[in-house]
Amino acid sequence: MMGMELSTSGTRKIAARRRQIAMSPYFGKPDFSGLGEVDAGRPKLDQVSLADLLRNGFVYPPHSILDNVKLATFGFNPKGDMYSAPEFRFSFRDSGKRKDADTGQDWIGTYHRLLCDAYSKSCAEMKSPWLLQSGGKDSTPLAIAAAEIRPDTTCITYLGGNEENEVGSACYVAQKLGLRHEILVCDPGRAYDRYLAIVERMPLLTADFALLSYVDLATTISESGGDGVVDGMGSDNYFGTPVDRQHRWLSALARGLRLPRFLSELPVIGRNFELCYLLSTLQMHPIERVFPGSRFTDAEVDELFGRDIAEQSKARLALFQSEFASATGPDELCAMALTVAGATGGFAKGLFTASALSLRAAYPFCDPDLREWVYRQVPLDQLIDPVTRTSKVLMRKHIATRFGELPYITRKGSFRFDLCGLARDRFEQVHAYALRTRKVLPGAARWLERNRDRLDNKYHASKFSLLAVVLPWIDTHSRPL
């Protein structure tokens, strides 16, 4: 187990041994084994990184939850010094994409071949791969490849709640392809117990909104004899991310205001998700509104810590501002922002969980041959439709060679976990963690007590889930050696 002390500055009497890890599926498998070596140097909790987690659900790279462990994620040079000279460059600029229209080449056939190769390579060391299968536009091409290359793949689908039911589409895809298919219905208490069972082995910390569902799935896979998880993340960066009118409007509303706390606690507002979401948006930085999920406001984060710290977290955006400022439009800016968030958010949840459960994690869409071909060779109109603004045109055409229009591709909800159920079932447990970690977050218990009656609103329940993830990790990893 890794011991830890608190750190509020870069100055300390005994310097802990510094570690730097290349952590991105685009770079290959990350090596977390070196984290055990930092025990001798008394690694310390980076409190600004903790503020990152509470404000955004992830730690701004190249930082990690530990102040002497830096992460070279995609966009950074893994051979560079992440302590003294980190420099972020987005690798899939629009300027590098092919501008001419479709020339009649067999784009679908080439895409299928490269995807099958990517699937085969990424799962080569797995004896029993399990594919996270939603029946949507990312996981369905992987299922098509699996049926051809690794028919021993098992598909598994998570039923997280009423808002986002992927089961029908996923079952149809798996059955038509002849793949075994399993369904895991969300039980928030079970998922949380599974997280607590592995939290001591989680090498670092993220608070991605899908972490608990991922842990639930990965534990089921492990208990069922699977030795690897196949994840459909990674294609958004190079296919592109079209920004719709709603998200442009929300970014425009993000003004970085400091609003009084009582507004979100008024009876009319406090129980209304949409109004709470709108109020929180007004208090965000425009870039940070792009990041998914509902999080603590800056004022709430300062209250949780009992001192001003949110501005130090927000200041970490400065590292990315020059690259953001050079974006040619909202789509490219969104892709840049999501690359930053996904590195230590979406990707991290899988990498950390797989490490804790001794599973292999595969990300076929991050394969260098596949991604470079799509980015540099496929025409723009096959990435994003210039008229309809439909995303991943080539991927959809690939799916259409086997299936008609899949329901989950056209209708997508917002939450994949029963957040309100978690708050209802595990409030006392999380409150106890808040009391045990009050030296780190002295305001956490008070926030829980004040908002207990509002946790049937998924806006407040989302914040509860952040504390539910963060507090046990702090409690476990901050014990003396």
What are these regions (language model features)?
Residues 436-481:
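Acidic, carboxylate-rich catalytic segments that either coordinate divalent cations
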Residues 159-221, 235-256, 376-384:
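ATP-dependent adenylate-handling ligase core
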Residues 107-131, 220-224, 341-349, 471-479:
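Phosphate/ATP-binding catalytic cores across multiple sugar-kinase/actin-like superfamilies
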Residues 119, 213-214, 260, 281-406, ...:
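Conserved glycine-rich, hydrophobic/aromatic-active-site segments
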Residues 248-282:
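Short, flexible loop segments at boundaries between secondary-structure elements
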Residues 1-193, 198, 203:
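Cysteine-centered catalytic environments shared across enzyme families
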Residues 7, 11-20, 37, 229, ...:
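Mid-to-C-terminal catalytic subdomains of enzymes
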Residues 207-208, 230-241, 279-288:
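Extended catalytic-interface subdomain
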